[in-house]
Amino acid sequence: MTVTVTPIDLGFDRCYVLQGDGVIVIDGGAPKKGAAFRRGLERAGVRPQDVKLIVLTHGHWDHIGSAGEIKAITGAPLALHEREVSWLEQSLTPLPPGVTPYGRMFIKIHGWFMPLIKVPAAKVDMPLGDEDVLLTDYGIPGRIVYTPGHSSGSVSVLLDSGEAFVGDLAMNKVPLRLSPGLPIFAESPPAVIRSWESLLERGATTIYPAHGNPFSADVMRRAIEDLSRTPTSVWLQERT
């Protein structure tokens, strides 16, 4: 089965509309982006009522901000890992720590503006666990897989054809990164690496980040190989 992928920019990041025998949406963008989402659906030739599931890769504000609006537009249920359900249902806006010096500076500055950001609360209909969730019932040949690291409840969508929609497990957009690679923010850098090892072992070939354009999984494979030669790297050390 061929799956058509349509990105829709919702602020600084994007959501993805996947069309197979059914339609799902991945991520909910920044707040107040419902109109942009509706326009994107129209460009993709998708009727709102055709969307059967909204998968949120994690609970940070720029991925859940318009989740409630998208749910209202489509009538589709929201899926989010159980560890982060409260973030959406209680309008919480935690930020992950920076991994690199630049990441730490970026997140510090970002934090100054967080009091201005309001995430509308929305009910999560499908709390996800750590086990895979097949998407065949929604007409998509693939699965939701647990890929913690950027946050403790991060998930990815991995299609049988190798396309991986990873949220912020990778980044490919200025000013976050100049080129595709590992995220500059993460709750657990070693967990990020383990999640990448799992995705690559399971056949990921093309990576679709929430920030930036898709790129080859070989980029991540080389990044992990390089880190394996630097055992003192922060990416391999748990925070204390």
Show which residues each predicted segment covers.
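Conserved beta-strand hairpin/beta-sheet module of binuclear metal-dependent hydrolase folds
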Residues: 1-44, 156-172
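A general structural detector for well-ordered alpha-helical segments in enzyme core domains, enriched
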Residues: 37-40, 66, 195, 223
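Residue-level marker for buried hydrophobic side chains located in beta-strands
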Residues: 24-26, 55, 78, 163-165, ...
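Metallo-beta-lactamase
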Residues: 31-32, 118-125, 132, 141-218
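Binuclear metal-ion centers of metallo-dependent hydrolases, dominated by the metallo-beta-lactamase
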Residues: 215-240
